[in-house]
Amino acid sequence: MVNKNRQLKEQKVAEIKEKMGKTEAMIMVKYQGLNVEEDTELRKALREAGVEYRVYKNSLAVRAINELGYEGIAQYLEGPIAIAMSYDDPTAPARIINDFAKTHKALELVAGYVQGEVFDVNKVKELASVPAKEVLIAKLLGSFKAPLSNFAYLLSAIKDKKEAEEQA
């Protein structure tokens, strides 16, 4: 029986380790005080953004974090903690959770681990203010478009001027 229990725990640690090893960002929150409806609303918003939201037994999560060599983050796993993990957009979990916490005071940001760096609450809030990757790409493309449009207009004006000179 003890062996079976230990084996199940080792499997769970391996699963947690696999998920955490692939993440771009992990944001930890205290969720105690959220009712079922609020928790479901948060989970839905995170799921729609491709963010996985899990509650793990802290001792198993700490073991996975230590095995991965993620230093400085295990200390935040005390009490009822949920972890939001994003596999592609490092800003998504911070942004969604921060917005949700503004209207649901029971949800409390604890810390984050983003691309190998530990983020305290203030850094997580800064990360939350960074626009989504798609918005940043759109802004970048927009900044390229304006000079290109101006250059095309300039070429058109030169062409029109030459045509006018040839006709004169």
Swiss-Prot record:
Residues making up the signal peptide according to the UniProt record: none
Keywords noted in UniProt: Ribonucleoprotein, Ribosomal protein, RNA-binding, rRNA-binding
One Pfam family this sequence matches: Ribosomal_L10
InterPro entries cross-referenced by the UniProt entry: Ribosomal_uL10, Ribosomal_uL10-like_sf, Ribosomal_uL10_bac, Ribosomal_uL10_bac_type
GO biological process: translation
Keyword Protease: no
SUPFAM superfamilies linked: Ribosomal protein L10-like (SSF160369)
Molecular function (Gene Ontology), one example: large ribosomal subunit rRNA binding
GO cellular component, one term: ribosome
PANTHER family noted in UniProt: 39S RIBOSOMAL PROTEIN L10, MITOCHONDRIAL (PTHR11560)
NCBIfam families named in the record: PRK00099.1-1
Recorded family membership: Belongs to the universal ribosomal protein uL10 family.
Quaternary context: Part of the ribosomal stalk of the 50S ribosomal subunit. The N-terminus interacts with L11 and the large rRNA to form the base of the stalk. The C-terminus forms an elongated spine to which L12 dimers bind in a sequential fashion forming a multimeric L10(L12)X complex.
Function of the protein: Forms part of the ribosomal stalk, playing a central role in the interaction of the ribosome with GTP-bound translation factors.
Protein name: Large ribosomal subunit protein uL10
Protein source organism: Clostridium acetobutylicum (strain ATCC 824 / DSM 792 / JCM 1419 / IAM 19013 / LMG 5710 / NBRC 13948 / NRRL B-527 / VKM B-1787 / 2291 / W)
